């Protein structure tokens, strides 16, 4: 029997490496198609909430779920598990993406990051001011943050529908802006929607953070081991009064961006595995083949930074599992008891719709224009103001994040439903505007290229 051909192994190793380091491309791909799943989940929730099965839909989320451990009982309803526990995983992935962008992405270079940072700030301030102008001197001012959020999945999903004719720079700026938007949303939740702060829980959360740092210091690389300190942080934040799902952001931002240190270098492990596979008669020795392949997998794993490895594993679960479940649990608004003749409800709906549909693009393009004209930053190559406006429309798709904030802002069920309807309408209008304007944007770019080619011929 001849030895394994050496030319096949590098191809396999190259394939594995390419898969591991295409994190950004995979992120965009998953986010884009998960937008469709989110839309279906939201539509299903609305159908159930306004059908003969509405009572079943409502009672489902009030189903108690928990466990007993001796005399210790832990039990919450299903709605709590979705919004406070499951969403922690979403914020974990968001935190990791923020960490990566700061380390090696669009936010790593401050000059490059100025445009999306300024745009995101404008896209938060304008919708908030619009909301406050409609609800000034009322009891509903605490809902000002509802129209400030951006749903990355939906925004990138609409962009994906427009095809590959959209410049790559536009994808990068939209993603960077949405990530900064997430950072601002996290800060808003932490500082404005955390009530009745109890300092006793802070010590528990700090202990959990210290345990994470200790695990990292001794070189523990398995993500499963960090569930314990994560649970401690989550419990501490809940006692403190801060929304416990922000545990995900803390863990995500603490995830190492460099490969974990090992006793044997990953390249040495891969080299040893290659030597084993290149030995004669290896095809007949299943034990040696299995051992070599295990070493290759370990070497590959050790070469990849935990922030990339864990995010790559969790991201599809969040995009196709956590977010659709959240949408199905919270987008079900019953129109039966909704009354637009109520002045309070009408103002909440109107301010959220206008904040998302008009405030977002207006804030983004105004802030960007002022930043560029003042010399603070420049537009990236091949980026035009029409492209910035397209980003503004897509950023107005608040959906899941806006619904999440509305649930923290409103305790009154009528006003909460009003805010949700405003989010659904505003996000829907923004999506349609983004899709329609995107088609116009593509056509304009195509015509410009045709004219450029004709001028070149002349």
UniProtKB/Swiss-Prot annotation:
Protein role: Na(+)/H(+) antiporter that extrudes sodium in exchange for external protons.
Q: What is its main location?
A: membrane
| Parts of the chain that traverse the membrane | 27-47, 78-98, 114-134, 143-163, 172-192, 201-221, 222-242, 249-269, 316-336, 346-366, 388-408, 421-441
- GO biological process assignments: regulation of pH
- Natural source organism: Bartonella quintana (strain Toulouse)
Question: Pfam families this protein is in?
Answer: Na_H_antiport_1
CC terms in the record's Gene Ontology section:
plasma membrane
Name by which UniProt lists this protein: Na(+)/H(+) antiporter NhaA
> What keywords were assigned to this record?
Antiport, Cell inner membrane, Cell membrane, Ion transport, Membrane, Sodium, Sodium transport, Transmembrane, Transmembrane helix, Transport
Indicate how the chain sits in the lipid bilayer: Multi-pass membrane protein
Annotated catalysed reactions: Na(+)(in) + 2 H(+)(out) = Na(+)(out) + 2 H(+)(in)
């Amino acid at each position: 029997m001849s030895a394994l051909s050496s030319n096949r192994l590098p191809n396999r190793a190259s394939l594995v490496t390419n898969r591991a380091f295409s994190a950004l491309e995979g992120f965009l791909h998953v986010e884009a198609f998960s937008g469709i799943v989110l839309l279906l989940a939201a539509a299903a929730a609305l159908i159930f909430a306004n059908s003969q099965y509405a009572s079943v839909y409502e009672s489902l989320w009030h189903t108690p779920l928990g466990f007993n451990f001796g005399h210790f009982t832990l039990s919450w309803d299903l709605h709590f598990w979705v919004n406070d526990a499951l969403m922690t995983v979403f914020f974990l992935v968001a935190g990791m993406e923020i960490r990566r962008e700061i380390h090696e992405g669009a936010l790593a270079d401050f000059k490059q990051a100025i445009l999306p940072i300024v745009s995101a700030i404008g896209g938060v301030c304008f919708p908030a001011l619009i909301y406050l102008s409609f609800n000034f001197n009322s009891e509903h001012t605490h809902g000002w943050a509802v129209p400030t959020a951006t749903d990355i999945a939906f925004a990138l999903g609409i962009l994906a529908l427009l095809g590959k004719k959209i410049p790559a720079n536009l994808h990068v700026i939209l993603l960077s802006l949405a990530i900064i938007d997430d950072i601002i949303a996290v800060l808003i939740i932490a500082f404005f929607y955390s009530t009745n702060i109890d300092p006793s829980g802070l010590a528990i959360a700090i202990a959990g953070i210290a345990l994470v740092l200790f695990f990292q210091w001794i070189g523990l690389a398995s993500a499963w081991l960090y569930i314990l300190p994560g649970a401690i942080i989550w419990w501490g934040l809940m006692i403190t009064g801060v929304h416990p799902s922000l545990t995900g952001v803390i863990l995500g931002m603490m995830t190492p961006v460099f490969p974990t240190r090992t006793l044997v270098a990953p390249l040495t492990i891969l080299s040893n595995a290659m030597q084993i596979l290149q030995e004669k008669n290896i095809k007949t020795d299943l034990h040696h083949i299995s051992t070599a392949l295990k070493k290759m997998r370990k070497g590959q794993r050790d070469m990849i930074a935990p922030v990339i490895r864990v995010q790559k594993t969790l991201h599809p679960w969040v995009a196709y599992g956590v977010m659709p479940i959240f949408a199905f649990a919270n987008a079900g608004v019953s129109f039966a008891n909704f009354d637009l003749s109520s002045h309070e409800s009408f103002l909440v709906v109107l301010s959220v719709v206008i904040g998302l549909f008009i405030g977002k693009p207006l804030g983004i393009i105004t802030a960007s224009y002022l930043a560029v004209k003042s010399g603070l930053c420049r537009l990236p190559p091949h980026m035009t103001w029409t492209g910035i406006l397209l980003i503004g429309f897509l950023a107005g798709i608040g959906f899941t994040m806006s619904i999440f904030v509305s649930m923290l802002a409103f305790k009154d069920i009528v006003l909460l439903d009003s805010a949700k309807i405003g989010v659904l309408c505003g996000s829907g209008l923004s999506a349609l505007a983004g899709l329609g304007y995107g088609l116009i944007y593509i056509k304009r770019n195509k015509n410009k290229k045709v004219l450029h080619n004709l001028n070149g011929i002349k």
